[in-house]
Amino acid sequence: MGNSTVRHFIKNNEFAFVLVLAVVLSFAIFGNGIFNDFTFDDVSVVQNRGDLKDPSNFFNLFISPYHHLEKIGLFRPLTMATYAINHYINDAVLPASSSSFQQAAGFRAVNIIIHALNSFLVFWLVRYLFPPKADPPLADKNKFLSYATFLLFLTHPIHTEAVTSIVGRAELLAFFWSLVAIYFFVKKDILLSSVSLLFALLSKEVALMVLPILFYISWIHFKNSFLATTRRTLVFALPVLVYVILRYKALGAYFLGDATTTIVENPLKFMDWSERIATAFKVLYMYLERLVWPIHLSADYSYNTILPVQSFLDPTFLVGAIFFVFLVWLLFFGRMRHLIGAFGALVFLAPYLMVSNLIQPVGTIMGERLMYFPSFGFLLLVSYALYKLFEKINKKFVYAGLTAIIIFFSIRTMIRNNDWHDARTLFTATLEESPNSLIARMALAAVDVTENKWDSAEEQLNIALNIYEDNSRVQNLWGIIADHKNDQDLAEEKWLRSLELNPDAVNAQINLAELYAKQGRLKEAGVYFKQVIDFYPVTEYVIRYAYTQIALNNPDEAIKTIEYYLGDDLNHPDISALAGTAYFVKGDYKQALFYLKLAQELGNMAKEIEEMMQISKGNL
């Protein structure tokens, strides 16, 4: 097949070609991260969520908070549903002995596929809104715009947090369904556009920003009247209303937003207005820096990574503010001469403003994943700048420059994927870029504790104490190290302090429950185990709580707990033994014998089971 034949085939099947190219390049560039472990928020949000692994709970996810705790104020049920499906597939195809790296692979493969589809939709939207002209030189120029934006978006290293980090799927899905909503909107299928908008909102709250983009396309690009555009977009009130109702059902009093953010997650929330605005523009500068030169990437920017701006003459504030003003000018005053640039400015500003902390503080000060949607607008602006260079210099130089950028982005992305290999790798890399990050310090210390590297853990604690002592995580780590040194009084003091700072600190609850159980203070242990399973119903702690209730001669509570959290399927040697023990203490020897015998058949040969079985038989 000659070159002319290939070109002819691609020309006649261009969208299919771009879709295949998107999938191939996405796996080529992000594929080296597929077999990374669950890291950071992946562990609590995805890996250890029992409600995501239970098929009978699937539809309940659509009225459940993103985290177990309503007060966190997050509602992303469609994203949770896709995690659940990943778990179901893992259970069906992977052996029980599979490693966490193997279990995580399917989740990341899905993320890569969604990113490929998103990149394809970027190509489609740019091509649709700014199609090639009939004149061959102009046609080449306009094709360049869509291909350049597509390739820059697909390869940009700032997207590793959204693609390689499993919890980044919320960004990916919100972007996907938002662009699908735009597709059906321009095709005048309002019903499917509304459904797509609802799916986008159910993926992540930031999808609300697609509404001004839809309005802009109808009003400015298609030149409909303001009144006609308003009437056309008002129909989207229905999917928004459905979303609000479901969100209220899931979050109750917290449906308007987060109530748990501390100074550690977002210091901006605790600054006065002028300092918050100035520092927020500094953060915009930092985003801009990473979009232009994505070398210094970090998984965490929380306290005390970003110092507050003390003066409006601070260069980082000035650059961020000037960039913001430029985008606003381009959007409102540049659209007559630079329609492409104006659209790029809108696509950056609409999602950015929702996470910028300029309008109101959000749950975090900064996160690279939050740039997933805004980066489309920025990269469209970059492509537009290169596009304009066609008028100034030989196009071969423009193509060479674009090729160099894409190669650089691709290599940097592949290198960055390796940082997410496992928890130690990730937090070590994070602290190299953000040495004052309290969250990263605590996370690395937790890895040290898991690996019995106690000297290193204590070193991280001492650094953390100098950053910010009055933090729940810091106090919890202090208690863990004290307990390791057999100073149980200090351990108890620090874990209680951790809970004073954050009553929902599940790790401190677990540690106190374990301490009290070890000391024989079973009633107090039971209180904390109950708090744990109310928020974090992992089988291990359900069993611990139930055995605590049995030891307190409260078998009915143990049986109720087993039925509520573990269901009727007790086809597990430890769970059936637990049920048998509860019925034995209750004096229901028939039920006790049934479950104890089942436990033995499943392989639990503990001598206590045999003893209880003999007593049960003697009482029948």
Language model segments and positions:
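Polytopic membrane enzymes that build or remodel cell-surface glycoconjugates and lipids
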Residues: 2-487, 500, 504-511
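C-terminal luminal/periplasmic domains and tails of membrane-associated envelope-modifying transferases
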Residues: 2-10, 424-620
